[in-house]
Amino acid sequence: MNKTIAATKAFVEAVDPEVTDKADWGIATPYLALQTAKAGAKNLIVAAENVHFKDSGAYTGEVSVEMLKEIGVEWVILGHSERRQYFGETDETVNAKMLQVLKNDMTPIVCVGETLEQYEAGTTKDVVKTQVVAAYKDVCPKCAARSVIAYEPVW
């Protein structure tokens, strides 16, 4: 819940002109600021922070792929550590979202990473591998090539 609409607008106005074509640069904003970010971003990729794995239905407070696409958002973060920690998202949930996003020709940004306890136990590689394998279950190689993996340790 960082960045209000006004703060998002100011950020995009300050950063967007500085973006070069040497890399893909983006901002993921809360839902309410997505349209503001899209309106101001000429060079920045604008991503949603989350999406639901169903096309539609009675999922109060959730946002569908169709809703995001309607406002021009084509990138979405999946499996962020905060979603896993505070909302109980699982590898299976991330996979369901991944399949939904890819089916709708959007670009998923799949977050993976270990906790401090897992790091200290020396299981980082196993944890991250498990998360990646689960996220990409039933994803064709061509579709996987349209995705991004973001490594972010949870500590």
Which stretches of residues belong to each language-model region?
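Conserved N-terminal beta1-alpha1 strand-loop-helix module at the mouth
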Residues: M1-V63, A144-A145
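Structural detector of well-ordered beta-strand residues that form the stable sheet scaffold
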Residues: G26-A28, A47, I77, I109, ...
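Alpha-helix-loop-beta-strand connector modules within alpha/beta enzyme cores
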Residues: Y31-V46, N95-P108, V133-A135
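Short, small-residue-enriched loops and turns at beta-alpha junctions
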Residues: M1-T4, F53-A58, R84-Y86, L116-Y119, ...
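Alpha-helix N-cap and loop-to-helix initiation/capping positions
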Residues: K3-F11, T60-V63, G88-T93, Y119-Q131
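Glycine/small-residue-rich loop that forms an oxyanion/phosphate-binding "nest" at active or ligand-binding sites
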Residues: K42-Q100
